[in-house]
């Protein structure tokens, strides 16, 4: 942790004596003394006499410049000179200078690493935001030409593929991104497809995953409903496409079928697979569900209950978190599997990567969605989150050698087993979540000013910034400038030579290990997500600069001329071998977060919206 004073007590110890209160008489006398010492010609008696004449001459001119009828008492009975000039006017204190800032506070006020502040209207960032919009248009054009209605695009083969149940996942995932970007032509195309085809697809399709369908399709529909003006008097980002009620009705139909995952289970833990056309559900082949998956559908079901007026969606989804509250944990940390049959955790594997990640994300986001401190019924979620983050710092955070990168590892065999210095790119959601949990969506400066940050919040915010650096260095260390799916870190107990990222100039080339099986890049959003949140909260433009660097690498190595972007097999080689798949989250998350990172803070403000784990913004509940 930083050796500097905690942010909340820095001002107590910082010397601000220069600006203590001084009386008007003292100000006046000191002004004369200062004037006399700064003018060499005033050192003689004649000079002093001339200065006095000049001073009183100016005063007389000021007095006589007003009308005589303004003399006497003013409306409040205070004595004035002729012309209405108060006695205090001549003895007025000079303008008060801004308080001198401590070095740390000075860094807080300056948003960039060189101390300059770059506004959201800066043409450089406006141009970069436009570049992201053009990238989204290019990605969509490839999908529209070769894969419209399929879940995903294979941009090199120029065809579509259904890997998520055949619900046109890319269409729904991309819809609210197009709304936010103001791309009305794409909103119209995607919205028309949703209105014409999606309801029929839902009624006819077979097995889908509860989690993936909820976060991508249900979440996308709900966000589109809100952003298109579904809740009157709130936001309306588009005037094209279907009426908002169309999105809502399709969302309800889909959610009604997904509810079978909850109602079919003998415990509050839902099954993971749903047969849509039958409205039935069953457990996974191994029997267990993923902890992250069953605990990362609550934002969507809560919001659907709010706008539909039917509590059944929220009731079923929230039973999961209430149940997990009762289960034994390891310093707030939980295994990555849970059984729908018994309701208990399965195994001891603890990690914040795959199958564990969004459990922790939704603890704090569901609490925020429900009004945070305004709703005491959900306080237990905040308590669980705080306990879990303490556990992360105590059990999972270590430093690499030789350069000391902060990373989050894993406990494959529980807290009594051996620590693994393995960190999925998925873990890079954590810096953003930590920052959001610390300030509750406010800027760091505002939260400090209002004295809203606890010591725990400050610890989490510091960890967020340290981890964000590590996540960015996972990009910097490779030959392509794009991160691998998984990285390992050199520690005093773990070392493996010859598996660097290919960028020998990186100062962290000896800290980060990239194994051959982990060198692929799937166009994932987690790092740019955290850069976006941290920029919004800290106003430090290094996060924008880093985001732009990542975007340029995507443009250079993953763009397909005929349309779309593709995953890579190996980020440590140039040119990299391409994998021929554009994940839906590249349009739904990665490009959305980059666009927002370079844009105005008033668009989807973090104190009024929470993003689901697929980057679909949903409004925070407000007490009326």
Swiss-Prot record:
Pathway: Protein modification; protein glycosylation. GO terms for cellular component: endosome; Golgi apparatus; Golgi medial cisterna; membrane; trans-Golgi network. It is found in: Golgi apparatus, cis-Golgi network membrane. Expressed in flowers, siliques, stems, leaves, roots, stamens and sepals. One of its GO terms (molecular function) is alpha-mannosidase activity. Inhibited by kifunensine and 1-deoxymannojirimycin, but not by swainsonine. Glycans are attached at residues 69, 114, 236, 377, 503. Its EC number is 3.2.1.113, 3.2.1.209. Disulfide bonds join 428-471. Residues 91-123 are annotated as: Disordered. It is a single-pass type II membrane protein. Its main location: Golgi. Ca(2+) binds at residue 613. It comes from the Eukaryota. Its cofactor is Ca(2+); Mn(2+); Mg(2+). Keywords: Calcium, Disulfide bond, Glycoprotein, Golgi apparatus, Hydrolase, Magnesium, Manganese, Membrane, Metal-binding, Signal-anchor, Transmembrane, Transmembrane helix. One of its GO terms (biological process) is N-glycan processing. The active site is at 212 (proton donor), 357, 485 (proton donor), 526. The chain crosses the membrane at residues 44-64. Residues 65-624 are lumenal. Ca(2+) or Mn(2+). Mg(2+) can be used to a lesser extent. Belongs to the glycosyl hydrolase 47 family. This is Mannosyl-oligosaccharide 1,2-alpha-mannosidase MNS3.
């Amino acid at each position: 942790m930083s050796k500097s004073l905690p942010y909340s007590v820095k001002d107590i110890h910082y010397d601000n004596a220069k600006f203590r209160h001084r009386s008007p008489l003292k100000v006046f006398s000191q002004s004369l003394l200062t004037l006399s010492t700064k003018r060499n010609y005033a050192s003689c008696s004649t000079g002093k006499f001339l200065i006095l004449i000049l001073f009183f001459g100016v005063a007389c001119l000021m007095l006589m410049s007003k009308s005589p009828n303004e003399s006497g008492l003013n409306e409040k009975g205070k004595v004035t000179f002729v012309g209405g000039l108060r006695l205090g006017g001549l003895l007025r204190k000079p303008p008060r200078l801004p308080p001198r800032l401590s070095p740390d506070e000075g860094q807080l006020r300056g948003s960039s690493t060189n101390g300059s502040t770059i506004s959201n209207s800066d043409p450089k960032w406006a141009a970069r935001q436009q570049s992201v919009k053009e990238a989204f248009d290019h990605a969509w054009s490839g999908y529209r030409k070769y894969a419209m209605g399929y879940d995903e695009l294979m941009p090199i083969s120029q065809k579509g593929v259904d890997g998520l149940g055949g619900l046109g996942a890319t269409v729904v995932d991309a819809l609210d991104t197009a709304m936010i970007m103001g791309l009305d032509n794409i909103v119209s195309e995607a919205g028309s497809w949703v209105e014409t085809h999606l309801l029929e697809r839902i009624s006819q399709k077979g097995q889908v995953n509860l989690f993936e369908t909820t976060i991508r399709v249900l979440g996308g529909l709900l966000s589109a409903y809100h952003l298109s003006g579904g809740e009157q008097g709130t936001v309306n980002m588009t005037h094209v496409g279907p009426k908002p009620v169309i999105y809502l009705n399709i969302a309800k139909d889909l959610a009604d079928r997904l509810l079978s995952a909850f109602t079919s289970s003998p415990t509050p833990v839902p099954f993971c697979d749903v047969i849509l056309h039958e409205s039935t559900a069953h457990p996974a082949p191994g029997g267990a569900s993923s902890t992250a998956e069953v605990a990362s559908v609550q934002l969507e079901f809560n919001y659907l209950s709010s706008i539909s007026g039917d509590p059944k969606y929220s009731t079923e989804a929230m039973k999961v978190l209430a149940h997990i509250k009762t289960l034994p944990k390891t310093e707030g940390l939980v295994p990555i599997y849970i059984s729908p049959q018994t309701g208990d955790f399965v195994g001891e594997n603890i990690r914040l990567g795959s199958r564990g990640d969004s459990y922790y994300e939704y603890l704090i986001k569901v609490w925020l969605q429900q009004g945070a401190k305004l709703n005491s019924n959900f306080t237990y979620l905040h308590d669980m989150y705080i306990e879990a983050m303490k556990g992360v710092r105590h059990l999972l955070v270590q430093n690499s050698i030789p350069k000391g990168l902060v990373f989050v590892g894993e406990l494959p065999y529980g807290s009594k087993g051996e620590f693994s210095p393995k960190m999925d790119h998925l873990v890079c959601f954590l810096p953003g979540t930590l920052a959001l949990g610390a300030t509750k969506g406010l800027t760091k400066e505002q939260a400090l000013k209002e004295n809203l940050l606890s010591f725990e919040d400050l610890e989490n915010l510091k960890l967020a910034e340290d981890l964000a650096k590590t996540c960015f260095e996972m990009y910097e260390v490779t030959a392509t400038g794009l991160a691998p799916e998984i990285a390992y870190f050199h520690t005093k107990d773990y070392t493996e030579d010859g598996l660097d990222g290919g960028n020998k100039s990186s100062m962290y080339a000896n800290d980060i290990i990239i194994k051959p099986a982990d060198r692929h890049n799937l166009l994932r959003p987690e790092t740019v997500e955290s850069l976006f949140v941290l920029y919004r909260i800290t106003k430090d433009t290094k996060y924008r600069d880093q985001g732009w660097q990542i975007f340029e690498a995507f443009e250079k190595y993953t763009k397909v001329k005929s349309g779309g972007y593709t995953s890579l097999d190996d980020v440590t080689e140039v040119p990299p071998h391409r994998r021929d798949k554009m994940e839906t989250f590249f349009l739904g998350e990665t490009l959305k977060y980059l666009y927002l990172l370079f844009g105005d803070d008033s668009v989807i403000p973090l104190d009024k919206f929470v993003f689901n784990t697929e980057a679909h913004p949903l409004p925070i509940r407000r007490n009326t």
